[in-house]
């Protein structure tokens, strides 16, 4: 079963405009009941482009890539719904400390105080 806090590779194409596309890591942010019963998942895309100014809706994490940990940004300002058919394979489970940061950034992204 796919669980909240897991990171998977997913095919995000096709896209429009400034959306993140291609095959890239995504963080599952949907609750586990939804993950179990829904044909879709709510995810946040992840990028290795960490050279720009970080926003309060972004969380820096290290995720495995090519047998080493790579600094990456979870883009919680770009959350989207994907069909489960777009999910390719699991990369890792995010640490609980990082999920606390994700929850804070998600609140900012959707305007929850």
Which functions belong to the PLM regions below?
Residues 1-113:
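Conserved functional hotspots at enzyme active or ligand-binding sites that engage polyanionic ligands
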């Amino acid at each position: 079963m796919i669980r909240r806090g897991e990171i998977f590779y997913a095919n995000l194409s096709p896209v429009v405009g400034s959306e993140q596309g291609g095959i890239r890591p995504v963080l599952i942010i949907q609750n586990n009941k939804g993950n179990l019963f829904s044909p879709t998942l709510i995810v946040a895309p992840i990028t290795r482009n960490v050279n720009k100014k970080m926003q309060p809706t972004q969380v820096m994490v290290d995720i495995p890539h090519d047998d080493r940990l790579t600094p990456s940004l979870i883009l919680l300002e770009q959350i989207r719904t994907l069909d489960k058919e777009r999910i390719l394979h699991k990369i890792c489970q995010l640490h609980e400390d990082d999920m606390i940061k994700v929850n804070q950034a998600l609140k900012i992204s959707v305007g929850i105080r």
